[in-house]
């Protein structure tokens, strides 16, 4: 299993603070039942970071505040 590093994600979202917010929002969406955009069996937090690193999710997460 390949490890996800912050550097992988920073290539997609250069600002660390925005990266944390986007990953948190996406992880919350995944834990509420949204479909992952990648094949994975990881927990929501890791899945969110993988989606960001692969460019499947980006700063648009900051415009979608989970409810």
Swiss-Prot record:
InterPro entries with a match to the protein in the record: DNA-dir_RNA_pol_omega, Pol_omega/Rpo6/RPB6, RPB6/omega-like_sf
Pfam families reported in the protein's UniProt record: RNA_pol_Rpb6
SUPFAM superfamilies noted in UniProt: RPB6/omega subunit-like (SSF63562)
Cited function: Promotes RNA polymerase assembly. Latches the N- and C-terminal regions of the beta' subunit thereby facilitating its interaction with the beta and alpha subunits.
The protein's Enzyme Commission number: 2.7.7.6
GO biological process terms held by the UniProt record: DNA-templated transcription
Presence of keyword Transcription: yes
Gene that encodes it: rpoZ
Identification of the protein by name: DNA-directed RNA polymerase subunit omega
Gene Ontology MF terms in the entry: DNA binding; DNA-directed RNA polymerase activity
Family, as annotated: Belongs to the RNA polymerase subunit omega family.
Keywords assigned by UniProt, alphabetized: DNA-directed RNA polymerase, Nucleotidyltransferase, Transcription, Transferase
Residue runs in coiled coils: none
Gene Ontology cellular-component terms listed: DNA-directed RNA polymerase complex
Oligomeric and partner information: The RNAP catalytic core consists of 2 alpha, 1 beta, 1 beta' and 1 omega subunit. When a sigma factor is associated with the core the holoenzyme is formed, which can initiate transcription.
Keyword Transcription: yes
